[in-house]
Amino acid sequence: MIKKEEVYKIGLFNKPHGIHGELQFTFTDDIFDRVDCDYLICLLDGIFVPFFIEEYRFRSDSTALVKLEGIDTAERARMFTNVEVYFPVKHAEEAEDGELSWNFFVGFRMEDVRHGELGEVVEVDTATVNTLFVVEQEDGEELLVPAQEEFIVEINQEKKLITVELPEGLLNLEDLEED
């Protein structure tokens, strides 16, 4: 059985395309194209299920048409509408270019060297020019932290921990400090 910590979300299947079972795929990470891994993992009814990729072709920088093995009709493809798509962490770590997308870090905890625990990275916001980690604090409040290498001190993949050193004044961190 595939566990949540063994995968990370890379996108979403939208609606079927055509009559032969192709799916429109909106992705935030093109790792499936950069790494030798012939399957994607879908979250179906709370269970991570692998599906082999028969073929795919890009439509833009963030969309592709994907054909999965055994999904040969529009009717079968419809079952995948709005299904979240994940990629195995072990294969992402093998990327030849050494580049991991920011989305790889969703689920990691984040701490600041001066202020300690910030929270958990729950999302990556790419809606603006500056990519942001959306970090959920213990109290449920969200922090927006710039996803910039210059602020990252260390990434511990085993502990799923990102240590950052954020410039003073970047965030309102007074609320995080324990008195």
Swiss-Prot record:
Residue span, PRC barrel domain: 97-170
Domain comment in the entry: The PRC barrel domain binds ribosomal protein uS19.
Name of the protein this chain belongs to: Ribosome maturation factor RimM
Entry function: An accessory protein needed during the final step in the assembly of 30S ribosomal subunit, possibly for assembly of the head region. Essential for efficient processing of 16S rRNA. May be needed both before and after RbfA during the maturation of 16S rRNA. It has affinity for free ribosomal 30S subunits but not for 70S ribosomes.
Localization (cell): Cytoplasm
GO terms under biological process: maturation of SSU-rRNA
Assembly and binders: Binds ribosomal protein uS19.
Keyword Coiled coil in record: no
Record PANTHER family: RIBOSOME MATURATION FACTOR RIMM
Family: Belongs to the RimM family.
InterPro entries: PRC_barrel-like_sf (IPR011033), PRC_RimM (IPR056792), RimM (IPR011961), RimM_N (IPR002676), RimM_N_sf (IPR036976), Transl_B-barrel_sf (IPR009000)
SUPFAM superfamilies attached to this UniProt entry: PRC-barrel domain, Translation proteins
Molecular function via GO: ribosome binding
This protein's encoding gene: rimM
Source superkingdom: Bacteria
